[in-house]
Amino acid sequence: MEFVYDVAESAVSPAVIKVIGLGGGGCNAINNMVANNVRGVEFISANTDAQSLAKNHAAKRIQLGTNLTRGLGAGANPDIGRAAAQEDREAIEEAIRGANMLFITTGMGGGTGTGSAPVVAEIAKSLGILTVAVVTRPFAYEGKRVHVAQAGLEQLKEHVDSLIIIPNDKLMTALGEDVTMREAFRAADNVLRDAVAGISEVVTCPSEIINLDFADVKTVMSNRGIAMMGSGYAQGIDRARMATDQAISSPLLDDVTLDGARGVLVNITTAPGCLKMSELSEVMKIVNQSAHPDLECKFGAAEDETMSEDAIRITIIATGLKEKGAVDFVPAREVEAVAPSKQEQSHNVEGMIRTNRGIRTMNLTAADFDNQSVLDDFEIPAILRRQHNSDK
């Protein structure tokens, strides 16, 4: 077993997280995050519609395709949106340069967002930036926009590390038939807000500059494809289970679950000194129930002085998920291999407990999981993988 204790130095720079909103929907999402005081990130808005962009609250604003569109928008044509982004490629590159992680948000199916998102993602990847897109999909009754959105999604997938899709059709199902349009779209924006805030909380400490190993975040989210994100909050007895159930059961995401997840990032936040080892164990057991045998799981525990002592907040981001109807590809040589026994299988799990003093990291081998004395020596909960629905 490897045990490392690092004391963070105040001179260490935290990871730089930027969020860029594209088109009308993406720019509205930026306004929502600014209004909700999401900290630790830099906001950028880019649009072909000059009038709409002028009203945006992002610190950095980019007018796309001034020569092409004259500030009048892309007219729901993604080809124009793409060309506009190419016209201002240098401005986009300058705005996102220096980021360790970039969130791209937009509403797919229109002109500016659908066309420019793949361009922005391609630029980000060329700069070595961890790139995650959080996008909405049109209502099924929107006809042509649905097909335009799907074509845009296929292009976007080629360049992003992880992709979170929020279908508009889920909004009424999840929120009820009486929900207003404003409330529904705000709920969709909040998925992005929670994802950004959750990652920011994992990577930075508000009271002291502590940079949790950003390489761990990259391990979970790099080149992983479809992803899901959820956040849960609970108080009182059984708070850990209730918050975890909320986090993994987001009704707004696109028919994805933790089943078969290959990468999971878990962040647990409580008041100082209020997280129990048994709660940490319970959270991780729930997460591991449906995971892939080769799961990469990273978890952090943060302390927030503003939270009550009986409260807990849990953020979970799972990556490497299958889309609805997708089937895993299994190479022929793997079919002939002898499957390891249940006792031999283990997950690569790293734990990081963050306090105002520093970071404690522990790496467990497969043998360590079967050696209770090793776990007891370091007061680590027995986080054991449970095979779920093995016949599936």
From Swiss-Prot:
Chain sites annotated for binding GTP: 24-28, 111-113, 142, 145, 189
Biological role: Essential cell division protein that forms a contractile ring structure (Z ring) at the future cell division site. The regulation of the ring assembly controls the timing and the location of cell division. One of the functions of the FtsZ ring is to recruit other cell division proteins to the septum to produce a new cell wall between the dividing cells. Binds GTP and shows GTPase activity.
Name of one Pfam family that matches: FtsZ_C
PROSITE patterns: FTSZ_1, FTSZ_2
Quaternary structure (record): Homodimer. Polymerizes to form a dynamic ring structure in a strictly GTP-dependent manner. Interacts directly with several other division proteins.
Family matches, as HAMAP family: FtsZ (MF_00909)
Name of the protein: Cell division protein FtsZ
Recorded name of the encoding gene: ftsZ
Key word Nucleotide-binding present: yes
CDD domains in UniProt: FtsZ_type1
Superkingdom in the source lineage: Bacteria
GO terms for MF: GTP binding; GTPase activity
Subcellular location: Cytoplasm
GO term, biological process aspect, one: protein polymerization
Keyword Nucleotide-binding attached: yes
Entry's Gene Ontology cellular component terms: cell division site; cytoplasm
Sorted UniProt keywords: Cell cycle, Cell division, Cytoplasm, GTP-binding, Nucleotide-binding, Septation
Assigned protein family: Belongs to the FtsZ family.
